[in-house]
Amino acid sequence: SLACALLLPGCGSSEAAGDFAWAINVGGEAYETMDGTRFEQESSVTRGTVGSIETIKGSQDSFLYESYREGDIEVNHPIPNGTYDITFHFAEPDEIGQGERVFDVYAEGGRVIGDLDVVLFRDKKTVSALTVTVPDVVVDDGELNIHFAASVNEPILSALLVRTRRPVSKSWELVWSDEFDGDELDTSSWSHNVWKPRKVNDEDQAYTARPENVRVEDGMLVIEAHKEDYDGASYTSGRIHTSGKRDFLYGRFEARAKLPGGQGTWPAIWMLPSDPFTYATTCEGIEDWQGHDDCDAWPNSGEIDIMEHVGYQEDHIHGTVHTRAYYWKMWEQRKGRILIDGATENFHVYALEWTPERIDIFVDDAHYFTYVNEGKTWREWPFDEPFHWILNIAVGGVWG
């Protein structure tokens, strides 16, 4: 199911306020982030040695990553009993490759992140900001206890943010939803993309409008990828969108979904601008603009990824924004990652809250990514035009 809601004027704020519990800048001084979160000067952290990084990419708050601890790090902090979502901040300080620093993270006696390779997790980049959120950590003895265990080289940590779960604001008013409770896809809201393989991201699948790939049954939308020879491809799948039919500027967007698993799968719940040429400088009005090498509509006009999941890292959910100023080719992509249980076995709610001031992304109301409007130009914030839903499963490609 999917839903879109708007915040009623004068009824509060969509900002992720009120969920803050404790935050520290490891090895560094106190700092207030662009979204207003106050990180304290390091406390409650022992062991390891303090280091520094001169230049950081991929974050609106690079100061948080300029200091870090390396070694057998421990965190022991008094905190009220309860359930917390913990965001760990990392940046690889050394020019090393994938597999050259690997460690585990433990909280309250249990392993919460296994085989954490900062370079691998950050798209094989060093000196780039990485956040990993672990939800539902239960503290029952009045103290939060975290420690790190090395597998290869020494663990590192740049900052730590501890949150309580906040309820969804009652100020949202539902403006559109699709529960997929009919017998077929509602074509007044949805359209298919029918594409050959390799059109974007070097993906292996052909997108079709066949019911084998996209259908509504038993009260659910089903998007299904198949290994088969079809139209020059070795796989088929489905991709649908609401462009020109259900376009939205700001609001809360929710999708309840169960994801496919397996190496090579790359499902996504995401949004593109409904007028992709708003900030394009090299093209205008090209109907087939996606994957067009001479058109800079992407990344100029933006992209919001509410959920991406790649099969080789099951249960790792990614939320991302793409802009001209900050995208992957420049090592400056702004993104967050959360680890959940049963992404391919259970339904979870993937959500976006989007206002003129900021973008926040959630899974099951666990807040794990924020991007703030810096008040500069369209290059940093193209998110002032209507966007539309896209649902798809890619196969293979540059990431899958």
Language model feature labels by segment:
Residues S1-A5:
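Sec-dependent signal peptide recognition
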Residues P9-G10:
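C-terminal motif of bacterial Sec signal peptides marking the signal peptidase cleavage site
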Residues P167-G400:
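GH16 jelly-roll
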Residues L6, V75-H77, V132, V152, ...:
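Compositionally biased, intrinsically disordered/low-complexity regions enriched for serine, proline
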Residues E15-V168:
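Compositionally biased, intrinsically disordered or flexible polar/acidic segments
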Residues L6, D19-A21, T83, E100, ...:
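Generic structural microfeature
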